[in-house]
Amino acid sequence: MGKETIDAAILAHRGWVSRIKTGFDGINTEHFDLASTVDHDACDLAWWLRKDESRNLLGPEAREHIQKIHERFHQLCGLLGAQLNQRTAGPQHNELLAELDAISKEIVQILLQARDKEA
């Protein structure tokens, strides 16, 4: 995952958070494909995490950690996307949004550290 790929992954994660948040703000009215939204193995980040390069840049503990939080990130996107598809905010949507935002920031921080190691 070169610098450009890491930057693209960062933008993609920020994009997910923005799409979800603007959905609850009524700005984004898209319908979420929940099957692809929850599939944490289908995105570029998951592909990179399966490669040796990620192990070398992250180390085994950070790599395992980012894999776990990345999976949770996609679960949250699915839960929130389902609420948006139904045009209803669940009782815990604020907590889910806060968790999504926190996980996204943590993923970005880990990716920035990996990018800086590669430079």
Task: Indicate residue ranges for each PLM-predicted region.
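N-terminal membrane-sensor/transducer module of prokaryotic signaling receptors
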Residues: M1-A119
